[in-house]
Design a protein with these regions (language model features):
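Glycan-processing catalytic domains of CAZymes
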Residues: 1-141
Length: 141
């Protein structure tokens, strides 16, 4: 194992209680003692609180899905995010980068033009971007 990819820290968004926040910190602190890198997937509410109230010694990177793109599960279609959503995630990732984190984006798009736009957007902001044409991240359809 060369690092941890930690999912579900967005539980703090659903249950914004100090006990949840402290519990996530405890888990991350335990992982940090291994000397391995820690990348959080999502969890923007937790990460923003942590980075604005603590000295960042736990998080090496953050991954955010759907910064530029979006997936409409009800219609089963890939789309682009609206400007306000894009700006929100951009501010979040920029905050993380300003605290020493590497920012990753995971986008979902099939349209070649949207894929190029998403990659260019990530590159312009200094994010490492992966684009999948499959919401399930499967290799084959």
């Amino acid at each position: 194992v060369d690092g941890f990819f930690v999912d579900n820290t967005d539980v703090y968004y659903n249950y914004p209680q100090e006990s949840i926040y402290d519990g996530i910190l405890t888990i991350l602190d335990y992982m940090n003692h291994t000397g391995r890198k820690i990348i959080l997937n999502g969890g923007d509410c937790f990460v923003k609180k942590y980075l604005t109230t603590e000295k960042n010694v736990l998080i090496d990177g953050v991954n955010q899905e759907n910064v530029f793109t979006a997936y409409d599960f009800s219609k089963d279609i890939y789309t682009k995010n609206d400007q306000s959503t894009r700006e929100y995630y951009t501010e979040y990732l920029d905050l993380a980068m300003s605290h020493g984190c590497t920012a990753y984006t995971l986008e979902y798009a099939m349209d070649p033009t949207i894929r190029r736009q998403a990659a260019a957007y990530a590159g312009k902001h200094g994010y490492i971007c992966y684009i999948s044409d499959n919401i399930g991240l499967c290799l084959g359809r």
